[in-house]
């Protein structure tokens, strides 16, 4: 036994000496530090050679390359396990979504992004302690309302983008209802994500399977609380975006190279879970910020030609089983026009991918609220209008302005007629003088087609007034029904005859 150990030591020493000479001939170390590094490397290689984990040849470069390749394979196996773990994917999704929002937003003294690090579970535990009439004592209310909107000199929040996913379960409905109250009080729309489980699905890839989405909500008792939430006034301040969008290309030499080592991420075009996705609420947040930066209003946030497009999405192509090449849909699933209309009708904001391109579009921007139906057609039309986010953003901003204006006017000597005249002159700054002929750019900067303000005295309370603002925004095209007819004469020609 002792002789075997002696022979092993002698063999190791001989191997180290020979390989040291090979490396010195190849690399030619010029300093003592370099020679020491070579000696240390040789010792490590010799130990691995004796364990029969590697084979050393006379070609030093080839031996080292083989060793590095073996290390890269081991690292790749471990990194793949980390990258595709559920906890890591959730963490990466949050950071890449936030990076998408910040990188695509041009901030300045008027457009600011503030980040609050609070998990959905933590927020639910907190809001649960302030249920009922105590909701206005919650930390969220104080943060969003009191510290900004309700504070002299405060800067009201224009929108809240939350990296959460909600479904119809009682805890989610309870939390969403509490948040909606705060958002409505502060006139700050709340945009977040919808989970596929809200439609009883494991993944959004199942979205094409149901024949009728509306029946899921109307013929299932599980959605009683959800439908009740949709019927509230506060629900108009909630927007649920879906599905997720691709946050990055898979790592690989031909897709997303890694400089540190040779790494190929283990992905499969058919395996949805092995990709990195981000919340669609971030994409909607980018559109909202872009509209505000360009026009000062958040009205152009939906539609292909009106600010709803999300550009430069990662596009990953992969070989198919039949020998062809396919592209992974960067929005989880391609949504048809019919399905998009169904989703909007049921209170969602779908992100629709344009086929064979790297961009997608928010066609609609419907809030969670289900518009009420009245006997009066005008009242029903008003309800439909107030349930759409582009119009709500404009009204919310006017609410922010008005609170600041009224706060500054307190104590001034103003009669009712003076207040009414002043408000009407002020509101006309945001009314398009010629809405029938003005450009889309003008409509975006002046979001109102007409406006009127009425100020009334409050009986029994001198110095107090009640102001009513009537705002008519520019209507955005929601749909167009086309009929084709074969005729011998055009209607205009027949009328002329």
Give, region by region, the residue ranges found by the protein language model.
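N-terminal-proximal low-complexity accessory segments that begin disordered
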Residues: 1-121, 125-128
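Generic, well-ordered alpha-helical scaffold segments in large soluble proteins
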Residues: 74, 78, 94-101, 182, ...
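Long, charged, glycine-rich C-terminal linkers/tails
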Residues: 93-98, 109-120, 435-458
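Core mixed alpha/beta domains of very large multi-subunit molecular machines
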Residues: 95-114, 124-154, 171-180
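Extended, regular secondary-structure scaffolds
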Residues: 133, 148-330
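Long, contiguous, structured domain-core segments that constitute the functional module of a protein
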Residues: 261-422, 482
